[in-house]
UniProtKB/Swiss-Prot annotation:
This is Large ribosomal subunit protein uL15. The gene is rpl15. Residues 154-165 have a biased composition (Acidic residues). Residues 30-47 have a biased composition (Basic and acidic residues). It comes from Haloarcula marismortui (strain ATCC 43049 / DSM 3752 / JCM 8966 / VKM B-1809) (Halobacterium marismortui). Pfam families: Ribosomal_L27A. Keywords: Ribonucleoprotein, Ribosomal protein, RNA-binding, rRNA-binding. Part of the 50S ribosomal subunit. Interacts weakly with proteins L18e and L32e.
Length: 165
């Protein structure tokens, strides 16, 4: 393949468009950040605040893990004494498996993937899909003390909302 320089021999402007375009910075609309308040205003974020931020005291951070990850690694977890082998199945405290569990407010198991082993999982919260998949494979789910408190609070708020209607 021929070089670009060689291909452009004989052309007047070497790919620069009109002969006027390569003079100074006029074709670019100025140098650097010039025109940010005038002719290039559309390239900048709008000024001012917008949106809503929830108060910090009501925000909760969840550490999550999918049942797929637990199921795929359960034999390794048992070898590392993180999971216990019992009656042909495995008992796993999910808080010991999730790396971010110490920094998070609670640990939740999500339902992505398949469950092939009989698992007894202990965690603060479970998605409906995770609960169904674990129980469908012959296992069970158990809530921690924190999980039971959270569930009781959720039921209280649901009852209060139902009373208001």
């Amino acid at each position: 393949m021929t070089s670009k320089k060689k291909r452009q021999r004989g052309s007047r402007t070497h790919g620069g468009g009109s002969h006027k375009n390569r003079r100074g910075a006029g074709h670019r609309g100025g140098r650097g950040d010039a025109g940010r308040d005038k002719h290039e205003f559309h390239n900048h974020e709008p000024l001012g605040k917008s949106g809503f931020k929830r108060p910090q005291k009501v925000q909760e951070e969840a550490a999550t893990i999918d049942v797929r990850e637990i199921d795929e690694n359960v034999t390794l977890l048992a070898a590392d004494d993180v999971a216990e082998v019992e009656d042909g199945g495995f008992r796993v405290d999910v808080r010991d498996v999730v790396e971010e569990a110490d920094d998070a407010d609670y640990v939740k198991v999500l339902g992505a993937g398949q469950v092939r082993h009989e698992l007894t999982l202990i965690a603060d919260d479970f998605s409906e899909g995770a609960r169904e998949k674990v129980e469908g494979a012959g296992g069970s789910v158990e809530l921690t003390d924190l999980g039971e408190e959270r569930q009781a609070e959720a039921e209280e708020t649901e009852d209060a909302d139902a009373d208001e209607e």
